[in-house]
């Protein structure tokens, strides 16, 4: 009995200590809902609609508030003004990468997405340089995307106008563009090694967007001891790591320092130059992780946006008709669309922007962290605190985009029908951590969609009013429901 009393006393003390520590921290941080010991505010958040939960909290606590994800606090920025003030006006201080236990487990602080400090700066700077050298923003990259767009059209023709799920084909195209940049070569859509690699990358992104993974990230101790889809990520990462190791080995054996062929070659040259420096961030392990990051960030995100775009065009046939009319007027039927066409196609440009705004692909962005102690809007945020930026609150701001829950390309058109830019358009985030592949993604979306609509009419299997565009998953990423359509050659 005495032992039981002692145990209860110890547990009570730990409980009170946890309450005291959280109370002390909350006195310095922005206000927020009262957390429970150990689990924080987890049960106050709808893991199937995190953005909706953040919006509800912001109505009570304002645009800057604190949530406890497990035992650790995170500061949430809600609305354009708060997000801009942090990520742009105080970009350096908010440029850290916040806690993401599942990614940290496999990336070990390496790569371009989840690294921090000088390591992140060095790898990002190098990656941007290498991509520019390979033609990013130039005609050479555009040629690759146009080539892939024609391959995509040929694959769609093979459906013979029959109902099909576009997921597979729309995944192959952007993945092949990344392959041509990383490995020099594209792959046939029937290449089994390519297909397996692509599926492993895409499956990991889907799992990371699931509600269960939000639980794992908040309570990382579950990762080792609980069954679940997170173990599939481990198997996939091991496969991807092995696949990339073979590719890197092939590049090492055929490397010509005077004639780099692709991203891996540029990295291997940089690695050779840094061999004398024991502190160099350029290692083979970091190369494999960086390449894995480039695939994860540059394939599933673009293919998901393409899938969502076609679904929205099926839902809104009047929009599709206007886009195809503009394609006929500007491009015609006898040449391939090119990036120079975009400035002459304001409605098409507006449609693509509206797709990205409406679907809100990464609702709460990847977590940031402050790189130093900072006073922000009269609140004290300690170094290392995780920062959650609600991109949903910016992309669906009703002042900037009237009726934001309605799909309307007019959100990006002025009264004269010309394309209208918006500072609120930040599907790729903003500031220091803005997506390094934004330019490539914008090029792919324009060229793939215009080439598809130049060559096919889209036919839905159901009436447009019966098409549901509600995302089936709304965690890390918003994923569209499965659907079928017919590509009718024109």
Swiss-Prot record:
Top enzyme class: oxidoreductase
Keywords, in A-Z order: Endoplasmic reticulum, Heme, Iron, Membrane, Metal-binding, Microsome, Monooxygenase, Oxidoreductase
Induction of its expression: P450 can be induced to high levels in liver and other tissues by various foreign compounds, including drugs, pesticides, and carcinogens.
Record GO cellular component, one term: endoplasmic reticulum membrane
Domain of life where this protein originates: Eukaryota
UniProt keyword annotation of Calcium present: no
EC assignment: 1.14.14.1
List of residues binding heme: 435
UniProt cofactor(s): heme
Family membership noted in the UniProt record: Belongs to the cytochrome P450 family.
Name of the protein: Cytochrome P450 2C27
UniProt source species: Mesocricetus auratus (Golden hamster)
Classification of source organism: Eukaryota, Metazoa, Chordata, Craniata, Vertebrata
Gene: CYP2C27
């Amino acid at each position: 009995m005495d032992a039981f009393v002692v145990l209860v006393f110890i547990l009570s003390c730990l409980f009170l200590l946890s309450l005291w520590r959280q109370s002390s921290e909350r006195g310095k941080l922005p206000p927020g809902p009262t957390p429970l010991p150990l689990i924080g505010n987890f049960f106050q958040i709808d893991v199937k609609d995190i953005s909706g939960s953040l919006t509800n909290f912001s109505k009570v606590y304002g645009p800057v508030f604190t949530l406890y994800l497990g035992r650790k606090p995170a500061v949430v920025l809600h609305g354009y003004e708060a997000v801009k003030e942090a990520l742009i006006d105080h970009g350096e201080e908010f440029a850290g990468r916040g806690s993401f236990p599942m990614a940290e487990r496999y990336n070990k602080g390496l790569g371009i997405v989840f690294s921090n400090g000088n390591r992140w700066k060095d790898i990002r700077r190098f990656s941007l340089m290498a991509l520019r050298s390979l033609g990013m923003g130039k005609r050479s990259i555009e040629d690759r995307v146009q080539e892939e767009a024609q391959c995509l059209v040929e694959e769609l023709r093979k459906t013979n106008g029959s109902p099909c799920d576009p997921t597979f084909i729309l995944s192959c195209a952007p993945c092949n563009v990344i392959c041509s940049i990383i490995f020099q070569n594209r792959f046939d859509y029937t290449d089994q090694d390519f297909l397996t690699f692509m599926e492993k990358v895409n499956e990991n992104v889907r799992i990371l967007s699931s509600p269960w993974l939000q639980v794992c990230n908040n309570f990382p101790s579950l990762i080792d001891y609980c069954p679940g889809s997170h173990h599939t990520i481990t198997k996939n990462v091991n496969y991807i790591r092995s696949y990339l190791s073979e590719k890197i080995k092939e590049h090492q054996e055929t490397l010509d320092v005077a004639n780099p062929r692709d991203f891996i070659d540029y990295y291997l040259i940089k690695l050779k130059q840094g061999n004398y420096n024991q502190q160099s961030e350029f290692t083979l392990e970091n190369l494999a992780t960086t390449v894995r990051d480039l695939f994860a960030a540059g394939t599933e995100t673009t293919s998901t946006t393409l899938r969502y775009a076609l679904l929205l065009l099926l839902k809104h046939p009047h929009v599709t008709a206007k886009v195809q009319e503009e394609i006929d007027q500007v491009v015609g039927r006898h040449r391939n669309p090119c990036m120079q066409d975009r400035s002459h196609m304001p409605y098409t440009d507006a449609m693509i922007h509206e797709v990205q705004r409406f679907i809100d692909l990464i609702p709460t962005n990847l977590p940031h962290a402050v790189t130093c102690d900072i006073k922000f809007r009269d609140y004290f945020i300690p170094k290392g605190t995780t920062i959650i930026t609600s991109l949903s609150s910016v992309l669906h701001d009703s002042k900037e985009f009237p009726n934001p829950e309605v799909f309307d390309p007019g959100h990006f058109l002025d009264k004269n029908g010309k394309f209208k830019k918006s500072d609120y358009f930040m599907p790729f985030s903003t500031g220091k951590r803005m997506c390094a592949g934004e330019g490539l993604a914008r090029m792919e979306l324009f060229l793939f969609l215009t080439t598809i609509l130049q060559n096919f009419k889209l036919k839905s299997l159901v009436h447009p009013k019966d098409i549901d565009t509600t995302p089936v998953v709304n965690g890390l990423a918003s994923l569209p429901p499965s659907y079928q359509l017919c590509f009718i050659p024109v």
